[in-house]
Amino acid sequence: DRADSLYVLTTPDTDSDGVALSVGEAVDLVEDSAIDSNYSATYWPWLQMNDTENNKYVWLPPTVEVMRNIALTDNVAFPWFAAAGLNRGTTNAVKARVKLRLDDRDTLYEGRINPMATFSDVGVVIFGNKTLQVKETALNRINVRRLLLQARKLISAVSIRLLFEQNDEVVRNQFLSLVNPILDNIRKERGLTDFRVTLDDTPESIDRNELNGRVFIKPTRSLEYISIEFNITNTGANFDDI
């Protein structure tokens, strides 16, 4: 209801008896929860972390590393970049409870669970960018949801300056002059491919002391799949003709 934050949920990786859940059982848990929201996300499996203060290893939900990487992403890039992958998704985990195979990761991702993947050279990595929204739209990606959260925050901060000014053409132009640069800067920083801001004011809305702005955006999607095709040509082939 707040519409101003992303909620990272914990998905259990053992049952009530402490028996490890399978990938399919984890997906079933999320499905049975009936959560359908682009303001929430979840990750799996749990991670073994080194508790240096007590000199022991402990199992923790991946939430702790996810939040760290979200903060890292905000510091080294922008909220509309995915907090995932080898650049912004590496963790401090000793190991994951389950070492996921490729088909395991695919099953989890299709089930709206972001996998904690294990790679021999870098360790455990956040390898997903999905929200818990069921419908396939731009908003079932975390970076797009966080883009909108940031844009709303920035636009709200400048729009409040106009409250109690005269509701006329001058204030409408001021609104556009404040909002357009914000979105243009996001576009320059690779968060949007295009945008448009319009004002939809009617005599009735003016009489209600309202200014109605509409923001249309084309968010930049994250790259999640790379397809590489190799072609063998004859020795005498001219690449310019291909």
Model-derived features with residue positions:
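Structured, hydrophobic secondary-structure cores that serve as assembly/anchoring elements
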Residues: 1-242
